[in-house]
Amino acid sequence: MFQDRLIIFDTTLRDGEQSPGATLNADEKVEIARQLARLGVDVIEAGFAYASPGDFEAVERVARTVGTEDGPVICSLARAIRSDIQAAAEAIRPAARGRIHTFISTSDIHLEHQLRKSRAEVLAIAAEMVAFAKGFVDDVEFSPMDAGRSAPEYLYRVLEAAIAAGATTVNIPDTVGYLTPAEFGGLIRGITQNVRGIERAVISVHCHNDLGLAVANSLAAIENGARQIECTVNGIGERAGNCSLEEIVMALHVRRQFFNPIFGRPADSTVPLSTIDTRQIYKSSRLVSHLTGMLVQPNKAIVGANAFAHESGIHQDGVLKNRLTYEIMDAETVGVNENRIVLGKHSGRNAFRTRLVELGYELGDADLNRAFLRFKELADKKKTVSDWDIEAVISDEIRLIPEAYRLEQVQVSCGEPGLPTATVRLTGPDGVERVDAAVGTGPVDAVYKAINRLIELPNELIEFSVQSVTAGIDAMGEVTIRVRQDGRTFSGHAANTDIIVASARAYLNALNKLHFALAHPTHSGGALAHPDAAAQKL
């Protein structure tokens, strides 16, 4: 099936959430889905409906909230098993346009050691389950898992059977990120040349980044006939991650003259090669990073803090004279507004609200009031408040779960010599204020021990990191942490000019998520109802 543009299939909420420690609750998934819709993705893979009640709820809520007539296609993953497919069909039912994505392994190593089935059995199952899914929706995607290590001739026959049974998209996963661009491009070319009926389906690819080749392999696939790319925001995902949405989109945007002829267009065509609103890329990256607790490395292409920074004097001189000397894209193209309008302590609510709208944030009255109070507090501490600061405040104040425990006060005493001591005052779910103190190896350790004495939620702190929001001695610091309890991970995030305060708030943010998960196990995902399902991943 020929397409003159690329279909962007976003799997941040499914494969991306499989990143270690990237657990999201249903509210957070809906918030990300809303932003993905604003970003302009064609398909949102909202989850694996059969895996757990929490996954089912998240897929259903995304379908109901974002799956409008003019919104993206909402998809659920399903093994090639009737119960999986039925759950997927039920979960995506509220969407105006739904898709079932079913899969089964086709590599000999998977058939022998995981499925314990013959090639003939797997081929028959693939055809039967695609036909079964077709009974629920017209839009059915089929994936031969571990296609990259499957025997080509057998892979061709399985794809033929899936297309004959009604698959409208056939997705080729490099499940373990093993192939090189030349090999993967050759695999896609072989499919276009040897699979009967391939013209009736869209060829999709799903590349993992184990060797750092996910984007390169995806581009090679496009050159050889693929017209859908499965990707995630910030490239998050299982193990080393997936193909990065922002990198694949901007590669096509910046190198449009190279890719236009591949899509059957004149080389000088200025029509975008995807439906993505690139100005939403940076905001999408920040939101996913904030909600998953997965920091973006500074040198990450497109969205890293250093992506548009120049340290070399020669480079700086060239950029000052003409940005094109050392930059191949404009930062504003991806939503990084370099004309950072500065607000101060005399700026009023209307100016603050107006700037939020210009930055792409639309807050309700309650969120706006909290954010404005934080802004005024910050403006009293800093001479000027930049857009970077405002974005950090917004990320901090938009709460998708109830704030059961609220920080009222934190004081620390430390120095050399001396024993770091912290006093913490909290308000609990019952509205009662509690105070306690503790000593630790450092001020943050003392604060966390004091909080643990006040909140009896056993957990293991597995990650703590601090990043500067802006330059300067009065810069805000962003603290991101992760805690683990019973195999589940919860992230916390906070920003403040005082790192100790930010650390306390980040820890409470994570503990509030943990508290909410224990009180609402279905809403937050809870234990997997079908762990065998979640164990199989593209």
From Swiss-Prot:
<dbReference type="InterPro" id="IPR005671">
    <property type="entry name" value="LeuA_bact_synth"/>
</dbReference>
<feature type="binding site">
    <location>
        <position position="15"/>
    </location>
    <ligand>
        <name>Mn(2+)</name>
    </ligand>
</feature>
<dbReference type="GO" id="GO:0003852">
    <property type="term" value="F:2-isopropylmalate synthase activity"/>
</dbReference>
<dbReference type="GO" id="GO:0009098">
    <property type="term" value="P:L-leucine biosynthetic process"/>
</dbReference>
<dbReference type="Pfam" id="PF08502">
    <property type="entry name" value="LeuA_dimer"/>
</dbReference>
<feature type="binding site">
    <location>
        <position position="206"/>
    </location>
    <ligand>
        <name>Mn(2+)</name>
    </ligand>
</feature>
<dbReference type="InterPro" id="IPR013709">
    <property type="entry name" value="2-isopropylmalate_synth_dimer"/>
</dbReference>
<feature type="region of interest" description="Regulatory domain">
    <location>
        <begin position="406"/>
        <end position="538"/>
    </location>
</feature>
<dbReference type="InterPro" id="IPR002034">
    <property type="entry name" value="AIPM/Hcit_synth_CS"/>
</dbReference>
<dbReference type="GO" id="GO:0030145">
    <property type="term" value="F:manganese ion binding"/>
</dbReference>
<dbReference type="InterPro" id="IPR054691">
    <property type="entry name" value="LeuA/HCS_post-cat"/>
</dbReference>
<keyword id="KW-0028">Amino-acid biosynthesis</keyword>
<dbReference type="Pfam" id="PF00682">
    <property type="entry name" value="HMGL-like"/>
</dbReference>
<dbReference type="GO" id="GO:0005737">
    <property type="term" value="C:cytoplasm"/>
</dbReference>
<keyword id="KW-0963">Cytoplasm</keyword>
<dbReference type="InterPro" id="IPR036230">
    <property type="entry name" value="LeuA_allosteric_dom_sf"/>
</dbReference>
<dbReference type="InterPro" id="IPR000891">
    <property type="entry name" value="PYR_CT"/>
</dbReference>
<feature type="binding site">
    <location>
        <position position="208"/>
    </location>
    <ligand>
        <name>Mn(2+)</name>
    </ligand>
</feature>
<comment type="subunit">
    <text>Homodimer.</text>
</comment>
<protein>
    <recommendedName>
        <fullName>2-isopropylmalate synthase</fullName>
        <ecNumber>2.3.3.13</ecNumber>
    </recommendedName>
</protein>
<keyword id="KW-0464">Manganese</keyword>
<comment type="pathway">
    <text>Amino-acid biosynthesis; L-leucine biosynthesis; L-leucine from 3-methyl-2-oxobutanoate: step 1/4.</text>
</comment>
<feature type="domain" description="Pyruvate carboxyltransferase">
    <location>
        <begin position="6"/>
        <end position="277"/>
    </location>
</feature>
<dbReference type="InterPro" id="IPR013785">
    <property type="entry name" value="Aldolase_TIM"/>
</dbReference>
<dbReference type="GO" id="GO:0003985">
    <property type="term" value="F:acetyl-CoA C-acetyltransferase activity"/>
</dbReference>
<keyword id="KW-0479">Metal-binding</keyword>
<dbReference type="InterPro" id="IPR050073">
    <property type="entry name" value="2-IPM_HCS-like"/>
</dbReference>
<dbReference type="Pfam" id="PF22617">
    <property type="entry name" value="HCS_D2"/>
</dbReference>
<feature type="binding site">
    <location>
        <position position="242"/>
    </location>
    <ligand>
        <name>Mn(2+)</name>
    </ligand>
</feature>
<keyword id="KW-0808">Transferase</keyword>
<keyword id="KW-0432">Leucine biosynthesis</keyword>
<comment type="similarity">
    <text>Belongs to the alpha-IPM synthase/homocitrate synthase family. LeuA type 1 subfamily.</text>
</comment>
<keyword id="KW-0100">Branched-chain amino acid biosynthesis</keyword>
<comment type="function">
    <text>Catalyzes the condensation of the acetyl group of acetyl-CoA with 3-methyl-2-oxobutanoate (2-ketoisovalerate) to form 3-carboxy-3-hydroxy-4-methylpentanoate (2-isopropylmalate).</text>
</comment>
